[in-house]
């Protein structure tokens, strides 16, 4: 494993112990005198912070092991006790903090991966296999204790001096941290930097004589000087990035805003409430790197200004509105936090103006502004089912070069972190067709595939697929073609009509280019028109044969007597509803007449749960004919109103 790959994997392993912090902070906060004033609740939260290094040892060991094993977690705990207790007998001043937990966790996880299947002689067989792992870890950590007892004091001094320099640098130090923090997001290494800043740098001793290290620990212990590595994130995550999302919405052409609006709104609300910004950042990180660089600079400026103004705020998870409300009046620690709201309004305006100007000035390809020839056709796949997820995982394995090229699989919140033999063999286009928003090739062996919130599920499914046997790489011929716009065929004068369709749906006509799905809107699926339904019955638009009804009953394909293939697709992304809201009234292979009922819908349910109920009705093989003539407009009635005419 190369150095970059190691630190990427370490960043993933750190997420498990960090995930317990919100619970600890909630308990500690609600137990305070100004809220519930219940000491045992506060102590419960404090206990987690007091034993954070041990929690890191357990969490890192489990995450580093090949199958998240409990034996590895136990080994991490054993190693931690051996290392910390043995080391101080050599030098009582040694205090490794969470770094001791991280190191022993790595030793425990590595020992498990190496020796969990070890076979010992019969008289020692009880101690073989997984039972051997804590024993081996304890031995190795004893050796480390003997080494670190002499080696660590100068390292500890260097870390302390570096931390003191950053703290003494004040606003400049926090600004540099904020800038580098955002720059490391694409590589995933920000978790390593955060761990040092939030759990190691700085020292605070409370009235009881307990020593706390790191910005988060010191903040929740009541250190009024803590927060320089946290405060400035609140204006960015709660206000700045939502301002960027609004700018990207208005920068998109008007006809495409409905397609990107829902997505931008959801990621902006997520950033505001929880401080989880990666889904929003990844929308422009790869499409417009210049914007991401400006975002990193603005983040650094925000941390710089917050420190300069004497603002001291903290969080347990991230800088969202939920954490802001919890820490707003935390005794002794929170100071001037109201100013973050003022900063937030200012940064909202800055992000909106800067993003708006830069996007238009440099014609950046933010969501909704992509060139038609760059848009990728995405297949409709239901990854909510086990079968669908397995197929998606198999496709991703093929896209990255097959099992021969794939060496290691890991995942975090939004990314598949993959180690490959040769990143040049990765099919970026196929990855994007499968739903990835970007592929990052960090070096020849390390890549990241940005797949969104289902990254961990997809990663787990990929591991299961690999365990079952080899998967071939996707062939060059299998590379999906980009969705070049399909020119609308023009009906030849005096051409013969081969099909006159009636509307299959009662509702209001919507032009095809207004459908909130690029595959339909670009006419890549076929030409036709769409309808926003107002009645529950879907009928056949012409006489012919039902050649296909999707198993989720949300769409069907009709072949007319003259060979026109008509696709009636009820709603957008309704496949994700797994058939709920739809009932088929005929079966595949049925001979039907125009106006015969095919599907019945629960419109109340569908309108509440579907992304959109705008329903395309297209001729998928329109290239076989001279064109079509749209006849419908306004409000139309199923089985009665002429929809369009196909000409030979």
Swiss-Prot record:
Which CDD domains does the record associate with it?
PTS_IIA_glc (cd00210), PTS_IIB_glc (cd00212)
Its domain description in UniProt is: The PTS EIIC type-1 domain forms the PTS system translocation channel and contains the specific substrate-binding site.
Q: Which superkingdom?
A: Bacteria
Q: How is the activity of this protein regulated?
A: P-chloromercuribenzoate inhibits the accumulation of both N-acetyl-D-glucosamine and antibiotic streptozotocin (2-deoxy-2-(3-methyl-3-nitrosoureido)-D-glucopyranose). N-acetyl-D-glucosamine is a competitive inhibitor for the uptake of streptozotocin.
Identify the species of origin. Escherichia coli (strain K12)
Cofactors required: Zn(2+)
Give the protein's function: The phosphoenolpyruvate-dependent sugar phosphotransferase system (sugar PTS), a major carbohydrate active transport system, catalyzes the phosphorylation of incoming sugar substrates concomitantly with their translocation across the cell membrane. This system is involved in N-acetylglucosamine transport. It can also transport and phosphorylate the antibiotic streptozotocin. Could play a significant role in the recycling of peptidoglycan.
Q: Which residues form the PTS EIIB type-1 domain?
A: 390-472
Q: Which NCBIfam families match?
A: EIIB_glc, PRK10255.1, PTBA, PTS-II-BC-nag
- Name the Pfam families for this protein: PTS_EIIA_1, PTS_EIIB, PTS_EIIC
- Molecular function terms, GO-annotated: kinase activity; metal ion binding; N-acetylglucosamine transmembrane transporter activity; protein-N(pi)-phosphohistidine--N-acetyl-D-glucosamine phosphotransferase activity; protein-N(PI)-phosphohistidine-sugar phosphotransferase activity; protein-phosphocysteine-glucosamine phosphotransferase system transporter activity; protein-phosphocysteine-N-acetylglucosamine phosphotransferase system transporter activity; protein-phosphocysteine-sugar phosphotransferase activity
Question: Transmembrane region positions?
Answer: 16-36, 38-58, 70-90, 92-112, 132-152, 159-179, 192-212, 232-252, 260-280, 282-302, 303-323, 339-359
Site positions (Important for phospho-donor activity): 554
Q: Please state what is observed when this gene is inactivated.
A: Cells lacking nagE and nagA reduce by 50% the amount of GlcNAc6P. Together with the mutations of the genes of the peptidoglycan recycling pathway (ampG, anmK, murQ, nagK and nagZ), the accumulation of GlcNAc6P is eliminated.
Question: Any idea what this protein is called?
Answer: PTS system N-acetylglucosamine-specific EIICBA component
